[in-house]
Design a protein with these regions (language model features):
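Alpha/beta-hydrolase fold active-site neighborhood
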Residues: 119-286
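Short beta-strand/loop motif that positions the catalytic acidic residue
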Residues: 294-296
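Conserved alpha/beta-hydrolase "acid-adjacent" motif
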Residues: 301-306
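Single conserved hydrophobic/aromatic residue that forms the stacking wall/gate
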Residues: 1-11
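Conserved hydrolase catalytic core segment
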Residues: 32-68
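Catalytic histidine-centered segment of alpha/beta-hydrolase-like enzymes
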Residues: 326-335
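A catalytic-pocket lid/entrance helix-loop region that shapes and gates access to the active site
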Residues: 53-109
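Conserved acidic catalytic loop of the alpha/beta-hydrolase fold
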Residues: 19-33
Length: 364
């Protein structure tokens, strides 16, 4: 059981308490001020800490920031659209490098291979089904070569409806044996960074699904419970319970995984049976010695761009946008981001740059 792992009452966990624990660590280290770097949830922790203890923050970088006005369900309920976009970007990426990955020379061919593997591995209600990308010239069968445009127009008009019908039919399938180490697990990582795309390609070339080990299941259980505890204890978003039956209707009518994800997250079902026991801190950077920095990818799949802008406004921060959709800017292969952040920490805490390029990616 969870409590035997020494976590105590996990449902009392919240970011404000963690921030106060963090300050105890600062005191123990004998540091009057600290520099703080936080990514993803760490941006919320950093903003809360800086609000509670502004006199102890020197320089603060928030990378891929959460929306401080949408804690927490509004943040989760706006991820699906960017994740759908990211999927198609990945299919485009593989197709443009077919000589390297051998997954198909059009996004549709790559998608078809991906979708077949997903179907074999996961079959049933939890299968993450998505629509096909548009067909291109390379997808036209030989017998239609004289009427390429007519074929593409007809195909691309009909395919979304066909996909929706197929998803509705598959909704009634019995699930396969569950192997949590699968293509969808790796694809989930690939949402966050192109760094993982080569792993997706390698898996697609040689699929080997595996179940979680006993130790992995225990670790996942602890992680999930802590995540749920912090989220539900602090949630200030009004749940939309009508989205729950809407999810069921959408599911059996063939909605894709990203539409369903947004509906489920915003419904509040994750926190069913629990009530918030605190209110999120109204974060502010008004009392900080130096202005913080917020880094945000335009198409971030986990913490959408607009939320980062709101965090920058609340914290009176320098706002620097990065091309692409990586969740985390400084943490990947982006020398210009490294230079900006390192100069901010080690030299003058002033940032004049407002834009960064997409991180580089090792295609192998």
């Amino acid at each position: 059981p969870l409590w035997s792992r020494g976590l105590g009452d996990v449902y009392k966990r919240q970011t404000e308490n963690t921030a106060r624990d963090f300050d105890m660590a600062r005191q123990y280290l004998g540091q009057h001020t600290i520099n703080f770097y936080g990514a993803s949830y760490g941006t919320w922790l950093g903003a809360v800490y800086a609000t509670l203890f502004p006199e102890h923050i020197d320089r603060l970088v928030l990378d891929s920031a959460v929306d401080p006005t949408g804690i927490w369900m509004d943040n989760f309920g706006s991820q699906g659209d960017m994740q759908r976009r990211r999927m198609y970007e990945m299919f485009d990426f593989f197709a443009a490098r077919d000589n390297l990955y051998h997954l198909g020379d059009t996004p549709l061919k790559v998608y078809t291979k991906w979708y077949r593997i997903i179907g074999r591995e996961m079959q049933g209600p939890t299968t993450p089904r998505i629509g096909a990308p548009p067909a291109q010239i390379g997808d036209v069968p030989p017998q239609f070569k004289r009427n390429i445009q007519l074929y593409l127009t007809g195909y691309n008009l009909a395919r979304p409806l066909v996909d929706r019908i197929e998803r509705a039919l598959h909704a009634w399938e019995a699930p396969n044996e569950k192997n949590e180490h699968n293509l969808w697990e790796i694809t989930g990582l690939a949402f966050t960074s192109r760094t993982y795309w080569s792993q997706v390609a390698a898996y697609m070339q040689n699929p080997q699904p595996k179940p979680l080990t006993k130790e992995e299941k225990e670790e996942k259980s602890v992680s999930d419970n802590v995540f749920r505890a912090v989220t539900c204890n602090e949630n200030a978003t009004v749940p939309k319970p009508l989205n729950l039956p809407a999810t069921g209707i959408a599911y059996f009518m063939g909605a894709d995984i990203f539409t369903l994800k947004n509906l489920i997250a915003s419904s509040g079902i994750m926190c069913l049976g629990t009530r918030p026991n605190t209110k999120p801190i109204n974060v502010t950077g008004a009392f900080l010695k130096n202005r913080p920095v917020v880094l945000q990818s335009i198409y971030d799949t986990q913490t959408p761009y607009a939320g980062g802008q709101k965090m920058a406004h609340a914290m009176n921060a320098y706002f620097v946008k990065a091309d692409g959709g990586d969740h985390g800017v400084y943490v990947y292969d982006n020398p210009e981001a490294w230079e900006l952040v390192n100069n901010y920490y080690l030299r003058k805490p002033i940032v004049t740059r407002t834009k960064l390029p997409y991180a580089r990616v090792d295609e192998h």
